[in-house]
């Protein structure tokens, strides 16, 4: 019996690079580093693409999700079910995702060859399969460098994580501190995002101009790296102060809140959607509860 080959590209003019082309460009690379091939970066920038990376630390088993092996010794207690792609099966725990399998890409061959979680997690997010003596940037930092902000009035890379927030400059690796991630603890906006009533906009601008002059003088006699990180965190905070409306939960309807759920991961992903729709280029969402 003949079957029609599945078309992995969605066919939309908005998606000029098909999944087949992207995977071909990735070639033998491991992790996300090869996504930064100039051809892909140029196409993504032209289309004004934005990215949400949802990282589940530890994660669910592939045998109970994307790659069930019912006849192997590793099989769990759950059945495999058919998807919208002939010949492709998911776990029975994912019935809704199985219905839209033709709209997503599932990569079953990615690995780091690193058995340690503590080193494997950053390795796959950086895309450096072997140690080269260089601190490689994480995906969000690399995209911030290559594509820049989707909206010049917003930071290009935000990170929503449990716990505390702050500016995480080490994510940028060799790109330099200015491409680090601004972390939002529990998805909350930075502390003191509202300017005190006692400080006018004119006074605030004058204070920041004085700060910038002091930083320039300080950099002339000391290393610039730490000062650059300090300046970048300040600039990002000022951008968010000017756009604090993007954190307004009143704009979210009850239907959205119900769809995403009241648990931390659901709330954080909904916040990521808010930020992406507002114009942030890249948002990473972390869950540490797996």
Residue ranges with predicted function:
Residues 1-290:
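Ligand-binding pockets and gating/stacking loops
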């Amino acid at each position: 019996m003949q079957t029609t080959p599945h078309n992995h590209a969605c066919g939309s003019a908005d998606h000029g690079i098909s999944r087949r082309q992207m995977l071909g460009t990735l070639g033998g690379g491991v992790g996300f580093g090869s996504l930064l091939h100039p051809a892909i970066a140029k196409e993504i920038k032209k289309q004004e693409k934005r990215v949400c990376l949802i990282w589940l630390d530890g994660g669910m088993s592939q045998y109970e999700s994307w790659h069930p092996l019912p006849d192997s010794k590793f099989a769990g207690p759950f059945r495999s079910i058919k998807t919208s792609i002939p010949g492709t099966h998911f776990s029975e725990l994912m019935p809704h995702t199985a219905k839209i399998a033709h709209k997503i890409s599932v990569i079953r061959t990615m690995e780091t060859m690193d058995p340690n979680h503590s080193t494997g997690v950053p390795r796959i997010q950086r895309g450096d399969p072997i140690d080269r003596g260089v601190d490689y940037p994480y995906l969000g930092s690399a995209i911030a460098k290559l594509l820049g902000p989707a909206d010049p009035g917003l930071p290009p890379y935000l990170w929503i994580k449990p716990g505390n927030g702050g500016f995480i400059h080490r994510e940028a690796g060799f790109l330099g501190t200015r491409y680090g991630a601004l972390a939002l603890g529990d998805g909350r906006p930075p502390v003191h995002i509202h300017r005190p009533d006692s400080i006018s906009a004119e006074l605030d601008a004058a204070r920041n101009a004085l700060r910038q002059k002091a930083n320039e003088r300080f950099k002339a006699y000391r290393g610039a790296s730490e000062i650059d990180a300090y300046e970048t965190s300040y600039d990002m905070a000022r951008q968010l102060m000017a756009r604090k409306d993007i954190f307004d939960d009143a704009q979210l309807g009850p239907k959205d809140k119900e769809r995403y759920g009241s648990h931390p991961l659901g709330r954080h992903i909904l916040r990521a959607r808010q930020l992406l729709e507002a114009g942030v280029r890249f948002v990473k969402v972390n869950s540490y509860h797996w």
